[in-house]
Amino acid sequence: MSRSLTGALAHGFLGQSPLWYKAIICLFLVLNPLLLVTVGPVAAGWALVLEFIFTLGMALKCYPLMPGGLLLVEALLLQMTTPQALYEELQHNFPVILLLMFMVAGIHFMKELLLFLFSRILLGVRSKAILSLLFCVLSAFLSAFLDALTVTAVIISAAVGFYAVYHRVASGANPREDSALDSDQQVAQLHREDLDQFRAFLRSLLMHGAVGTALGGVCTLVGEPQNLLIGHEMGWHFADFFFKVAPVSLPVLGAGLLTCVLLEKLRLFGYGTLMPEPVRQVLAAYAAEDDAARTQAQRIALWVQGLAALILIICLGLHVAEVGLIGLMVIVLITAFTGITDEHRLGRAFQDAMPFTSLLVVFFAVVAVIHQQQLFSPLISWVLTLPTEQQPGMLYLANGLLSAISDNVFVATIYITEVKQAFLNGGMSREHFETLAVAINTGTNLPSVATPNGQAAFLFLLTSAIAPLIRLSYGRMVWMALPYTVVMGGLGWWAVTYWL
């Protein structure tokens, strides 16, 4: 009996994660108290930080909230930080939590409008280079004001919808009835080549769209959660943030869009595949049927969502309230005027954001440990001993390398709080502090496109339903992101070093 109970407990621990992963987490939990007793709190603190980064890097094996949360519960029990310190950290960063709770949910109710826009572009533009550029530009623009994950989710929804329609037609099924999309057994030989080409076409569009969220996300206060966190520390509003970051973000945006066009024209790194004409004909016929069947209520809902989006942009630009509260207003406006009054339909809007919001609390617990043990103080002190003109570039590189394998919010939180403490201690001028803040912000946003671990939108795409359907693997994502990584990361470093 005891053996079966033990087996059930072992099986339930971290669910479907591999056994080796479970063993490593258990090893961490045993090792930390031993390190604390034998070599002291600083070494144990560094071990905890590295262990937490490991859980972020292994996000595809297990969502980091569970293993990271276990590590942080242990840290609290070992008194490496205190519940009060964690509470104060959360209180200080409450605007970021509001953003994730309400803004992401608010954008959820705009999905129909966004899906409509992306669908129109996909079928209305025949040039692949122009189509890719439009996808990248629209993703960048939307991500500058909306949540990057939601924008990515909309692009994925459009891609899944179009893929499903053609896959069913190629399999001889009704395009409006459910079928097994993960199997090609029923696909006629005549359509297999077109289907493979369509997969490559969708892969390139999705990657352009995902990169677009990073290009636009770095530009504004609400583009990424870490932007709001840094802006909050600096006391910057929407316009302040945009102009402070513009010397880096706008040249990188231009270079990123140029890279998009060149990749399509030169057909490098898996880009440049065209949509087969038979596929276009099937999708156009399907879209025409949808347009004809659209009801008056659905048309009104699109207008309401568009008006709410306009109000959102105006409110953000004028900073009429905290970003999260503006998101709550968007929820109220759209739901009130489109008839969404059911509690369960409303609740679904919050499902996407709450896991990451919970994980953010764990981030801040790690930051509380870092503060209490002063883990990063020597590193920041060393950077500040460098000549003033070298400090922004060095911070950019330090942020970029860590952000490529870890979470941007976590990395940005660590560096901005440590640099701010140095500023408060009289270690630099306000002007130089602002320069370093821009270096930290761009360093966490731009080089992180290198891997799916670095960008939440990339990780979301990799773990979505569309990835296996279009044969988008981890390695293929890294390969397709490589030219963007070199251009965005390299130009970002140059701009931070020489143009700020």
UniProtKB/Swiss-Prot annotation:
Presence of the UniProt keyword Cytoplasm in the record: no
Recorded catalytic activity of this chain's protein: 2 Na(+)(in) + 3 H(+)(out) = 2 Na(+)(out) + 3 H(+)(in)
GO cellular component labels: plasma membrane
Pfam families (UniProt xref): NhaB (PF06450)
Superkingdom field: Bacteria
Main location: membrane
The entry's keywords: Antiport, Cell inner membrane, Cell membrane, Ion transport, Membrane, Sodium, Sodium transport, Transmembrane, Transmembrane helix, Transport
Entry's localization field: Cell inner membrane
GO-annotated molecular function: sodium:proton antiporter activity
Transmembrane segment boundaries: 11-31, 34-54, 58-78, 96-116, 129-149, 150-170, 205-225, 241-261, 311-331, 350-370, 394-414, 450-470, 477-497
Membrane-topology annotation of the record: Multi-pass membrane protein
Family that this chain belongs to: Belongs to the NhaB Na(+)/H(+) (TC 2.A.34) antiporter family.
Cited function: Na(+)/H(+) antiporter that extrudes sodium in exchange for external protons.
PANTHER family the record matches: NA(+)_H(+) ANTIPORTER NHAB, TRANSPORTER ARSB-RELATED
UniProt name for this protein: Na(+)/H(+) antiporter NhaB
Organism: Pseudomonas putida (strain GB-1)
Lineage: Bacteria, Pseudomonadati, Pseudomonadota, Gammaproteobacteria, Pseudomonadales
